[in-house]
Amino acid sequence: MGNETSLPMEMCSNFDADEIRRLGKRFRKLDLDNSGALSVDEFMSLPELQQNPLVQRVIDIFDADGNGEVDFKEFIQGVSQFSVKGDKLSKLRFAFRIYDMDNDGYISNGELFQVLKMMVGNNLKDTQLQQIVDKTIGFADKDEDGKISFDEFCSVVGNTDIHKKMVVDV
């Protein structure tokens, strides 16, 4: 990877050239079939993600072009959101996108249910989970349109330190 590849990466990420080189090495190690893109299985070889119930959602968000794989540019842009230099708003937007599965700018009752179901599995009955979803929507949905906008999401989680936990070491 020469300078011609890393310079645009620096411009579209929170990483400097050395960090991009290190990430490039990590990417190439993960790219087991040398295809230039990471499949879901290759992503799952990351120990940090193996136990994460939301790994598929993370991959979906990283996969900007929706082709089912994450190329190096998508990888850099995705991981960049978890950089210590990443800003709070970007981290909140990423967290919001985990829940906004259809990417329409809102978290619906059904989307919140699906994501929470991924997290809790069968530890709660669906009726219990639905009660939590309904209460959460009722609490966060200030304009009472039945869904949570990004602004409403930020009103609820923006005062927490969630963005400080959304950091990976490069």
Swiss-Prot record:
Residues 18-46, 50-85, 87-122, 128-163 form the EF-hand domain. Ca(2+) 2 binds at residues 63, 65, 67, 69, 74. The keyword Translocase does not apply. One of its GO terms (biological process) is sleep. PROSITE patterns: EF_HAND_1, EF_HAND_2. It comes from the Eukaryota. One of its GO terms (cellular component) is synaptic vesicle. This protein has four functional calcium-binding sites. PANTHER family: PROTEIN PHOSPATASE 3 REGULATORY SUBUNIT B ALPHA ISOFORM TYPE 1. Belongs to the calcineurin regulatory subunit family. Calcineurin is a calcium-binding and calmodulin-binding protein found in all cells from yeast to mammals, and a calcium-dependent, calmodulin-stimulated protein phosphatase. Composed of a catalytic subunit (A) and a regulatory subunit (B). Interacts with sra. This is Calcineurin subunit B type 2. It comes from Drosophila melanogaster. The gene is CanB2.
